[in-house]
């Protein structure tokens, strides 16, 4: 509020009837002890303290503590249910891990047996193919040896005639005359033996 100079000049009405405190306006003779500290009021204060404490105790006992106890019981029940569920889930997880490990071991065993079977099958196929190839090579080798022996036999047959022709040419060149075929054949046969 805005104070004007005219309002500020007004003076408070004077109190008639005795001395007053300057700040409170309370008469000086009313100056006594603070009522809660007055020994004359202790019995009533103690009575009200007991009544208030009793009511507060009854309130706590009948209202607050049952609610708090109920909340604690609910929490304990929830915790025990959670622990039971956790142990159940842990058991299920352990069972799942055991089943997984068993299936993994079986899969490894199956993979090993499948690998062994595949290796055995490949080895058998390779052995069969090797035997077929060896048989084919033996057959070709036999045919080649037969051809070589026939070529050799033919060559040996012709060697005699070639030797006779060569001997005839040598005799003609050295002696200057011709020898008979029968003489040359007899000479080649005697040397070939």
UniProtKB/Swiss-Prot annotation:
Record CDD domains: ATP-synt_Fo_b
Cellular component GO terms held in the UniProt record: plasma membrane; proton-transporting ATP synthase complex
InterPro entries: ATP_synth_b/b'su_bac/chlpt, ATP_synthase_B_chain
A Pfam family assignment: ATP-synt_B
Keyword entries, A-Z: ATP synthesis, Cell inner membrane, Cell membrane, CF(0), Hydrogen ion transport, Ion transport, Membrane, Transmembrane, Transmembrane helix, Transport
Membrane-crossing segments per the record: 40-60
Family: Belongs to the ATPase B chain family.
Subunit structure as annotated in this protein's UniProt entry: F-type ATPases have 2 components, F(1) - the catalytic core - and F(0) - the membrane proton channel. F(1) has five subunits: alpha(3), beta(3), gamma(1), delta(1), epsilon(1). F(0) has three main subunits: a(1), b(2) and c(10-14). The alpha and beta chains form an alternating ring which encloses part of the gamma chain. F(1) is attached to F(0) by a central stalk formed by the gamma and epsilon chains, while a peripheral stalk is formed by the delta and b chains.
Protein name, entry field: ATP synthase subunit b 1
Species assigned in the record: Mesorhizobium japonicum (strain LMG 29417 / CECT 9101 / MAFF 303099) (Mesorhizobium loti (strain MAFF 303099))
Lineage start: Bacteria, Pseudomonadati, Pseudomonadota, Alphaproteobacteria, Hyphomicrobiales
Gene this chain is encoded by: atpF1
